[in-house]
Amino acid sequence: MSGQPKRLMVMAGGTGGHVFPGLAVAHHLMAQGWQVRWLGTSDRMEADLVPKHGIDIDFIRISGLRGKGVKALLAAPLRIFNAWRQARAIMKRFKPDVVLGMGGYVSGPGGLAAWSLGIPVVLHEQNGIAGLTNQWLAKIATTVMQAFPGAFPNAEVVGNPVRTDVLALPLPQVRLAGRDGPIRVLVVGGSQGARVLNQTMPQVAARLGDTVTIWHQSGKGAQLTVEQAYAGAGQPQHKVTEFIDGMAAAYAWADVVVCRSGALTVSEIAAAGLPAIFVPFQHKDRQQYWNALPLENAGAAKIFEQPQFTVEAVADTLAGWSREALLTMAERARAVSIPDATERVASEVSRVART
C-alpha cells in the first residue's frame, strides 16, 4: 500500500436525512487520515453546512424530476447529461478511490460519473423504501447498504449513521431511573415544523392537564402561533421553541417523542432509546411509514397515520402509558438500534476502495 492517503467523495444533498449521515461517515474516515471532498448542489443545505465541517465541496447543477411539467421532463436527459459531465470532470481532478452515495438528486449523475471512470460506488439507502435515484444506481453500484430491512432485498442492513452526542446518551434504564412527576413529551416537527403536530398537540395538552409537560419544536415562523394555541387551550406553561439546536439534550430530557418519521429521526430515537408516537408524512410511497414500522413491530412506538392523529387518540395513548411501560418501550427501541452504523458504512467504503 502506498503512503498516499485514501480519497473519498461523498455524494449527498437536499435534506438533513441525506447530509448528516454522510458527514458522520466523512468525519470517521477523516480521523483515519482519509481525504474527503463532497459533491452537492449550490442551492441546497449542503452548500452551507458541509464547509462548516471542514470539508471542501464541489457543485453540479441538477434537480428532481417529480412534479415537473412536460417541458422540464423533455429537457431532463440533457440536464442529466450535463450534470454527469460536470461530475466526471470534478472526479477526474480529485481522483477518488471510492465514492459514497448517501441520497439526493446529486447521487444520480455523480454515481454514473464514478462508474464511467471505474471508481467503486458504495450506496447507502437511509429509508425503508428506496428513493428513485438509489433504485437506479443500485444496478451499477459496487455495493449497496440499507438502514432498514426492505428497501433492497439482498442489501446488508447497517442502520443510519447518527450523531455521536446522541450515541453517547446514557442507556434508558440509567437515564430514566428514578424519574417521577409529569410525563415529559418532546414534540418535534423538523426545521419546517409539521402543521398537524402544531394544531393537535395543544388540544392534547388540554385533555391531559398536569400529567404531562411538553417541549414543542414548532418549526420556522410558527413559534408565536403555537404558543398562542397552548395559551388558548389553557396550557400556557408548556415550552415552545422554533428550533432545537441540541437534540441530544432534548432526547435526554424526554420520556416520549411525538414526531414525523424521517429516516434520521427514527434512527436517532432508536439510538437514544426513546418511545415514540410517529406521524408519517403522507406521501404516495409511504416512505416514512416504512421507516417507523420496525420500531412499532418491536413494541417501542405507535404509528398514527395522519387522518388517525386525533386529539382523542393521542391523548388516550399517552394517558395509557405508565412510566414502567415507557421504560420498557425505551429499552426495546435501544435494542433494535444499530449504534455502530457509522463504522459499518466506513468499513465497507474502505473495503471496496481502489488500491
UniProtKB/Swiss-Prot annotation:
A single MF term (Gene Ontology): UDP-N-acetyl-D-glucosamine:N-acetylmuramoyl-L-alanyl-D-glutamyl-meso-2,6-diaminopimelyl-D-alanyl-D-alanine-diphosphoundecaprenol 4-beta-N-acetylglucosaminlytransferase activity
Reactions mediated catalytically: di-trans,octa-cis-undecaprenyl diphospho-N-acetyl-alpha-D-muramoyl-L-alanyl-D-glutamyl-meso-2,6-diaminopimeloyl-D-alanyl-D-alanine + UDP-N-acetyl-alpha-D-glucosamine = di-trans,octa-cis-undecaprenyl diphospho-[N-acetyl-alpha-D-glucosaminyl-(1->4)]-N-acetyl-alpha-D-muramoyl-L-alanyl-D-glutamyl-meso-2,6-diaminopimeloyl-D-alanyl-D-alanine + UDP + H(+)
Record-linked Gene3D superfamilies: Glycogen Phosphorylase B (3.40.50.2000)
Record-listed UDP-N-acetyl-alpha-D-glucosamine binding positions: T15, G16, G17, N127, R163, S191, I244, A263, L264, T265, V266, S267, E268, Q288
Main enzyme class: transferase
Keywords: Cell cycle, Cell division, Cell inner membrane, Cell membrane, Cell shape, Cell wall biogenesis/degradation, Glycosyltransferase, Membrane, Peptidoglycan synthesis, Transferase
Cross-referenced InterPro entries: GlcNAc_MurG (IPR006009), Glyco_trans_28_C (IPR007235), GlycoTrans_28_N (IPR004276)
Family: Belongs to the glycosyltransferase 28 family. MurG subfamily.
EC number of this enzyme: 2.4.1.227
Physiological role: Cell wall formation. Catalyzes the transfer of a GlcNAc subunit on undecaprenyl-pyrophosphoryl-MurNAc-pentapeptide (lipid intermediate I) to form undecaprenyl-pyrophosphoryl-MurNAc-(pentapeptide)GlcNAc (lipid intermediate II).
Pathway recorded for this protein: Cell wall biogenesis; peptidoglycan biosynthesis
Source species of the chain: Salmonella typhi
Record's protein name: UDP-N-acetylglucosamine--N-acetylmuramyl-(pentapeptide) pyrophosphoryl-undecaprenol N-acetylglucosamine transferase
Membrane topology summary: Peripheral membrane protein
GO cellular component, one term: plasma membrane
Domain of life: Bacteria
Any one of the GO BP annotations: cell division
Localization terms from the record: Cell inner membrane
Keyword Translocase among UniProt keywords: no
